[in-house]
């Protein structure tokens, strides 16, 4: 629910983190980077990612009386995209350090840039690498696969992959900066025995991957039940994130589309800690 307290809390957290990161901005700016990022969070959390609605809301309510126009705001948001990602991973690392050896869940969900019938006319994304299939929904999509590592329902790491790539490819992309003896639960789509053994031998991280019926490493019944039980929570997290998205994410460039998708995950993580 949209409330003044939550918006102010988001701004305070963002502003404090930017100061801690020693982020520098031009002394001539009328709207600070903290206000730009907070407005983007408000857009993702309450306006389905519609930046212009959030921009007008922040100006009308007096949260950012010197708000930029639509074009300049978009340029400023792209300019702070790197500090935005740094803030997210710093927040995630702080939560992981506090948790110590804990249980994590890794899974993915698809985000389509358009409906399948409009793929040929789509100008935001181009190429066969964006064609993917969602096994859970038993349907094809054209867009990105969002890989998210969660701790008690809060995203702490994520990455965006082309829809065509398999889930186990994320095992070489995410840093997995978790404490030794931590367990990361995943479904059978992440099966890769070599990476599983390497993670345990090198970092003492247990990759608790679900097993297929024909797996050469079958699980005991109690281990299979534990893996299935632990993975259920992330579906609730994904439902909450996707509920904040519109049916179609409006963007005119590839970078803009990817930034908006990332914003939904990052804003949700900050929202959960308030």
Identify the residue ranges that each predicted region occupies:
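Short alpha-helical elements
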Residues: 1-274
């Amino acid at each position: 629910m949209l409330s003044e307290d939550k918006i102010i809390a988001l701004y305070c957290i963002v502003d404090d983190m930017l100061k801690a990161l020693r982020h520098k901005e031009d002394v001539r700016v009328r709207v600070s980077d903290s206000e730009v990022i907070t407005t983007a969070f408000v857009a993702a959390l309450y306006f389905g990612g519609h930046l212009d609605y959030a921009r007008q809301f922040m100006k009308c309510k007096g949260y950012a009386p010197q708000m930029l126009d639509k074009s300049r705001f978009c340029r400023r948001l792209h300019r702070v995209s790197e500090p935005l990602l740094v803030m997210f991973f710093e927040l995630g690392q702080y939560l992981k350090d506090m948790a110590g050896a804990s249980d994590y869940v890794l899974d993915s969900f698809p985000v389509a840039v358009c409906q399948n019938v409009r793929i040929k006319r789509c100008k935001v994304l181009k190429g066969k690498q964006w064609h993917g299939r969602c096994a859970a929904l038993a349907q094809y999509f054209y867009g990105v696969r969002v890989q998210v590592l969660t701790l008690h329902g809060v995203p702490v790491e994520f990455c965006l992959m082309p829809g065509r790539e398999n889930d186990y490819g994320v095992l070489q992309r995410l840093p997995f900066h978790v404490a030794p003896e931590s367990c990361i639960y995943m479904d059978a789509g992440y099966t890769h025995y070599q990476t599983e053994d390497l993670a345990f031998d090198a970092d003492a991280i247990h990759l608790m991957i679900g097993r297929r019926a024909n797996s050469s490493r079958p699980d005991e019944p109690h281990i299979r039940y534990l893996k299935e039980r632990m993975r259920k929570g992330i579906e609730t997290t994904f439902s909450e994130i996707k509920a904040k998205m519109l049916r179609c994410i409006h963007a005119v460039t590839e970078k803009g589309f990817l930034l908006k998708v990332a914003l939904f995950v990052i804003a949700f993580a900050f929202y959960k800690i308030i």
